[in-house]
C-alpha cells in the first residue's frame, strides 16, 4: 500500500505492480503523448513493461492530485530521462517523485506547490495483516 498525506497541498499517489499486459502497446497509444509512445516503442519488451508503469503511475498520481480523473492522460506529459529526475511537463507548480517500493513495483507521488519537502517512510507493521 502507498499513502500520501499533505497538510496544505494537493497530493496524489499511485502504486502499480509491474506485470505483463497483452494490450500494453494499445494502452500506451491511447493514453500517452506521441513522444512517450514513441519512446516506449524504441526499447525492449522487458524495458517497455517497466517504462509503461513508470509513465502510468506518474500520470495517475497527477490526476489523483488534481481530481480530474482519467480524462486526457495523453495531455499529461512526463519527462523520464536517464540520469535526471522525472518531471511533469504541465502548467502550474507541481512536484513529481518516483518511488521504487520493492522490485516489480512502480510508484509516484505528485504534490502541488513550489519547494516542497517530500519525506518518505517505510512502515511494515501492516505486513502481517
Describe every region a protein language model picked out:
Residues 1-129:
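Core catalytic alpha/beta fold that binds nucleotide/phospho-ligands
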